[in-house]
């Protein structure tokens, strides 16, 4: 029995703007149990959005600092809320608490839902290169059959949701019809809350990386699990 003890979870938006914090908090609270005390933060320094490897690497040291801070503040886990997982491995080296990245976690969960996986993010050119490479790093190069993105800037994703949804549907249908994708992974935290509607239209599982990772973080906290850690 898990009991009623409160566990602290931090969802870290690894960007220097707080425009995503309230939206993220609203959605994650819907799926978490009352035993989880969740907080959402962004960085005080770093890129305003992560749309390139440069942005990812620029954010990484600030992410590590926030993870160290969260550990000292008594958090039981941190979710790095960007599909590129900036600073994930370094954060695990310096922290004894659970640290999950939404990219790695959502791809792992996708393997349980279907064999042929498609990743649809923002920025088609970057996504095609970055997420095929990521699939290789995770040993999923035979599972990820399609990676692309909608050409809408991250900070513009919530300005016209109908346009965003149409673009996502077009890419997803291409992945399904031309590449036989069986599960779609949304490759950006800015697409939070759209997976259920997309799944109903497409008829295949659509993974919301933030919600899947937050839900898994709760389960892992309660089970007393955390990542293997070592200090170099």
Where are the regions that the model predicts?
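Short beta-strand segments enriched in small/hydrophobic residues
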Residues: 2-21, 117-121
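Short, glycine-/small-residue-rich phosphate/pyrophosphate-handling segment
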Residues: 19, 111-149, 219-232
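N-terminal beta-loop-helix "entrance" segment that forms/cooperates
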Residues: 41-61, 155-161
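Glycine-rich, highly charged phosphate/nucleotide-binding loops
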Residues: 53-73, 163-171
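Beta-alpha junction/loop-to-helix N-cap segments that form part of ligand/metal-binding clefts
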Residues: 60-90, 94, 188-192
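Hydrophobic alpha-helical
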Residues: 80, 84-87, 169-201, 213-214
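Short, acidic/small-residue loops that bind anionic groups at enzyme active sites
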Residues: 92-113, 198-214
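Active-site rim beta-loop-alpha module in soluble metabolic enzymes
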Residues: 123-126, 132-187
């Amino acid at each position: 029995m898990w009991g009623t003890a409160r566990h602290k979870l931090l969802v870290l938006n690894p960007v220097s703007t707080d425009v995503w914090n309230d939206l993220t908090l609203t959605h994650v609270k819907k799926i978490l149990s009352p035993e989880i005390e969740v907080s959402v933060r962004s960085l005080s320094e770093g890129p305003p959005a992560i749309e390139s490897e440069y942005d990812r690497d620029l954010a990484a040291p600030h992410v590590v600092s926030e993870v160290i801070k969260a550990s000292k503040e008594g958090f039981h886990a941190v979710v790095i809320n960007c599909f590129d997982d900036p600073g994930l491995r370094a954060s695990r080296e310096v922290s004894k608490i659970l640290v999950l990245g939404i990219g790695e976690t959502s791809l792992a969960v996708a393997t349980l839902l279907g064999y042929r996986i498609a990743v649809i993010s923002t920025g088609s050119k970057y996504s095609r290169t970055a997420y095929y490479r990521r699939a290789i790093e995770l040993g999923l190069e035979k599972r990820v059959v399609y990676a692309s993105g909608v050409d809408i800037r991250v900070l513009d994703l919530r300005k016209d949701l109908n346009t965003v949804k149409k673009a996502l549907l077009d890419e997803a249908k291409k992945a399904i019809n031309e590449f036989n994708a069986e599960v779609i992974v949304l490759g950006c935290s800015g697409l939070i809350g759209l997976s259920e509607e997309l799944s109903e239209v497409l008829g295949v599982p659509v993974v919301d990386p933030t919600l899947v990772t937050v839900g898994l973080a709760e389960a892992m906290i309660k089970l007393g699990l955390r990542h293997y850690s070592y200090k170099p």
